[in-house]
């Protein structure tokens, strides 16, 4: 039963990270379409924001694996 819970936690963390990055990329594409001259600035912010959006799911997956292997 614990394995199922850990699998669900890891899966939901991965889905959450993917949705977060997709929202960031969508906003950058919309911003670039509105103001093409700001493309560089928006890309830089995206390259900073995407890893931040992925950090929490990565930590959640690490915690799930720790619970699996240690518990």
UniProtKB/Swiss-Prot annotation:
Topological category with respect to the lipid bilayer: Multi-pass membrane protein
Coiled-coil portions: none
GO molecular function: lipid binding; proton-transporting ATP synthase activity, rotational mechanism
Positions of disulphide bridges: none
Cell compartments where the protein resides: Cell membrane
Keywords: ATP synthesis, Cell membrane, CF(0), Hydrogen ion transport, Ion transport, Lipid-binding, Membrane, Transmembrane, Transmembrane helix, Transport
HAMAP family membership: ATP_synth_c_bact (MF_01396)
Primary subcellular site in the record, as a coarse category: membrane
Transmembrane region(s): 5-25, 47-67
SUPFAM superfamilies linked: F1F0 ATP synthase subunit C
InterPro entries, per the entry: ATP_synth_csu_bac/chlpt, ATP_synth_F0_csu, ATP_synth_F0_csu_DDCD_BS, ATP_synth_F0_csu_sf, ATPase_proteolipid_c-like_dom, F/V-ATP_Csub_sf
Assembly information from the UniProt record: F-type ATPases have 2 components, F(1) - the catalytic core - and F(0) - the membrane proton channel. F(1) has five subunits: alpha(3), beta(3), gamma(1), delta(1), epsilon(1). F(0) has three main subunits: a(1), b(2) and c(10-14). The alpha and beta chains form an alternating ring which encloses part of the gamma chain. F(1) is attached to F(0) by a central stalk formed by the gamma and epsilon chains, while a peripheral stalk is formed by the delta and b chains.
Pfam families in UniProt: ATP-synt_C
Family label: Belongs to the ATPase C chain family.
Residues of the site described as Reversibly protonated during proton transport: 54
Purpose: F(1)F(0) ATP synthase produces ATP from ADP in the presence of a proton or sodium gradient. F-type ATPases consist of two structural domains, F(1) containing the extramembraneous catalytic core and F(0) containing the membrane proton channel, linked together by a central stalk and a peripheral stalk. During catalysis, ATP synthesis in the catalytic domain of F(1) is coupled via a rotary mechanism of the central stalk subunits to proton translocation. Key component of the F(0) channel; it plays a direct role in translocation across the membrane. A homomeric c-ring of between 10-14 subunits forms the central stalk rotor element with the F(1) delta and epsilon subunits.
Gene that this polypeptide is encoded by: atpE
Keyword Lipid metabolism on entry: no
Keyword Secreted applies: no
Originating species: Shouchella clausii (strain KSM-K16) (Alkalihalobacillus clausii)
Any single Gene Ontology cellular-component annotation: plasma membrane
Name of this protein: ATP synthase subunit c
């Amino acid at each position: 039963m614990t394995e199922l819970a850990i699998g669900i936690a890891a899966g939901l963390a991965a889905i959450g990270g993917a949705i977060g990055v997709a929202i960031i990329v969508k906003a950058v594409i919309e911003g670039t379409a509105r103001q093409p001259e700001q493309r560089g600035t928006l890309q830089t912010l995206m390259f900073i924001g995407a890893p931040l959006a992925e950090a929490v799911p990565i930590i959640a997956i690490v915690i799930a694996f720790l619970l699996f292997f240690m518990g």
